[in-house]
């Protein structure tokens, strides 16, 4: 088992104790992700499917729970072992949440919801925010790349229409990002996000 694939450990430390902080009787938690604004007034949503396929399609295992218990206890956190054991026993290790989102590649005005997540089992109300860290990381990096390249494409196209051939736009921003990012996963996510807007790339992991 690789620690990086253990979804239980794919969170912030403070999230681990939050199950103790919800009001008594809580049965559901609904969270959403939005771009609150910045340099651009529109965001290109991208990255969620890659996260789901990589981290959520496989169930957690007893080994995942044991390893998480050992690590988080040593880290000084009150691990919700009973909650994760319940997920393993009741749901065969699959996480009882539903995630909804706009289609990948959609251009969305800022201050609008991009994705939502909520628990589907009242016993697992705490799970929604446990997954927040991983979801934000999974979405914001490729979404930022896709958004940046979308706006860069507009600038290039404006000048092509004045001085060149607009039909060549798809190959006017070439991606060599594989050599400049922190990991192969980052290269793949950023490279795929670039391909939402352009066709030129040397980032092989982006087309896998």
Question: In which residue ranges do the predicted regions lie?
Answer:
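Generic structural signal of hydrophobic/aromatic residues within well-ordered alpha-helices
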Residues: 48-56, 67-72, 83-88, 131, ...
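Generic detector of short, locally flexible boundary/turn motifs and exposed helical patches
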Residues: 63-65, 76, 80-82, 118, ...
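Active-site-flanking structural segment that lines cofactor/substrate pockets
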Residues: 65, 69-104
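Low-complexity, highly charged intrinsically disordered N-terminal segments
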Residues: 29-80
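Buried, small/hydrophobic-residue-enriched core segments of structured protein domains
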Residues: 2-39, 87-96, 105-109, 114-208
């Amino acid at each position: 088992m690789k620690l990086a694939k253990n979804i239980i450990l794919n969170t912030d430390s403070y999230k681990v104790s939050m199950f103790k902080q919800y009001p008594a009787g809580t049965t559901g938690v609904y969270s959403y992700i939005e771009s609150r604004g910045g340099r651009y007034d529109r965001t290109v949503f991208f990255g969620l499917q890659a996260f789901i396929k990589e981290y959520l399609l496989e169930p957690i295992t007893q080994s995942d729970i044991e390893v998480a218990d050992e690590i988080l206890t040593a880290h000084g956190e009150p691990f919700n072992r009973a909650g994760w054991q319940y997920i393993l026993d009741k749901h065969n290790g699959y996480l009882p949440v539903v995630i909804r989102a706009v289609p990948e590649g959609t251009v969305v005005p800022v201050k609008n919801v991009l994705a939502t997540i909520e628990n589907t089992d009242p016993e697992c109300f705490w799970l929604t925010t446990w997954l927040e860290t991983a979801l934000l990381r999974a979405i914001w990096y490729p979404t930022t790349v896709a958004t940046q390249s979308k706006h860069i494409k507009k600038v290039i196209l404006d000048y092509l229409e004045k001085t060149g051939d607009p039909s060549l736009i798809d190959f006017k921003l070439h991606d060599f990002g594989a050599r400049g990012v922190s990991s192969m996963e980052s290269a793949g996510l950023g490279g795929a996000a670039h391909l939402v807007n352009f066709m030129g790339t040397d980032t092989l992991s982006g087309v896998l």
